[in-house]
Amino acid sequence: MLDLDLRRRQGEFRLDVRLSAGPGVTALYGRSGSGKTSVINMVAGLSRPDEGSISVDGRVLFDSRSGIDLPPEARRLGYVFQEHRLFPHLSVRGNLEFGQKLLPSAERTQSLDKVVELLGIESLLDRRPAKLSGGEKQRVAIGRALLASPRILLMDEPLAALDPARKAEVLPFIAQLARRFSVPILYVSHSMDEVLRLADTLALMDGGKVAASGPLESLMGDPGLRPLTGRYEAGAVIGAVVSSHDSGFGISRLAFDGGTLIVGRSELPVGAKVRLRIHARDVAIAIEPPDRVSIRNVLPAIVVSVAPADSFLVDVILACGPTRFWVQITTLAQAQLNLVPGMRVHALIKALTIARGDVASVD
């Protein structure tokens, strides 16, 4: 458990952060200048709060009242930066072993072979960094940080310098880290796609403060947080399981608490647990079940709430069993449908609107 109570003034900018981050991946998300990198650098010991405290699993790293301020090398934290920062004169193996050599053998909790296998870098061990692609360099940097046996792994926009293809290469490895190695991760990003793929817990930062924090699914489905999560990111994040594939039609079926969704053919095996994003703008509402319609996902639902978003849009929350969907419709549509809480309706979701990138494995 990472516990933060941080205050610092930098010119006109005031940072005032209180946050507890447990197991899994906690994402710090916010606009540029909201204070995300300042927080992670204070945790790492690269900058100093004016006052407050930092502790990991009850071990105090910083406390302004008692005068505790451990240097970075004594904090047992791994840090992955935007740039790989590998040693150019060492091979990949040498860079990885450097992380291990920082600790006595008895304190090493991670195996070189296990890290190399997870990150898929067996064939790179004898190469120098200059001979690696951007994605390969970042995977090696992640491995070096892991082999320092950190109590928590800090990642400051580790994919920001990569092109889309290299990001797609590295993301699956990061997604497995917390689960395979039981290392909590504090992940800084301004990319909602990355956050939705990786985070268990979301902390929304705004103006130097944590404006809201909690389970990813809860925060992403809250219309009141739209100014922080982004208008075009609005929607539901739900858990599901791959229940079947149909190669003849090129589709997969995903079972969730509330029904089954048809999506484009997934490469994930039957039984795989996934996280699924459904944009609020991609859901339609019908009062009666439609007849002979091309939309494959027609889900019985109950209206939970209806609230104006602006002069053009209305936010509607639907319940399909215990699962909530956030839907955006026009004010004209609301005037014609006259939706009210408790009304029975049908949610319509085109299979084509659920992109492959919106379905992520959580196994």
Swiss-Prot record:
Compartments where located: Cell inner membrane
Broad EC category: translocase
Binding site for ATP: 30-37
Topological relation to the membrane, as annotated: Peripheral membrane protein
SMART domains per the UniProt record, alphabetical: AAA (SM00382)
Matching Pfam families: ABC_tran, TOBE
Gene3D superfamilies noted in UniProt: 2.40.50.100, P-loop containing nucleotide triphosphate hydrolases
Catalytic activity: molybdate(out) + ATP + H2O = molybdate(in) + ADP + phosphate + H(+)
Keywords, in A-Z order: ATP-binding, Cell inner membrane, Cell membrane, Membrane, Molybdenum, Nucleotide-binding, Translocase, Transport
Cellular-component GO terms for this entry: plasma membrane
EC number: 7.3.2.5
Domain (Mop): residue spans on this chain: 292-358
Taxonomic superkingdom: Bacteria
Keyword Transcription regulation attached: no
Domain ABC transporter, chain residue ranges per copy: 1-232
Molecular functions per Gene Ontology: ABC-type molybdate transporter activity; ATP binding; ATP hydrolysis activity
KW Hydrolase (keyword) present: no
Function: Part of the ABC transporter complex ModABC involved in molybdenum import. Responsible for energy coupling to the transport system.
Subunit structure comment from the entry: The complex is composed of two ATP-binding proteins (ModC), two transmembrane proteins (ModB) and a solute-binding protein (ModA).
Family: Belongs to the ABC transporter superfamily. Molybdate importer (TC 3.A.1.8) family.
Protein name: Molybdenum import ATP-binding protein ModC
Organism taxonomic ancestry: Bacteria, Pseudomonadati, Pseudomonadota, Alphaproteobacteria, Rhodospirillales
UniProt gene name: modC
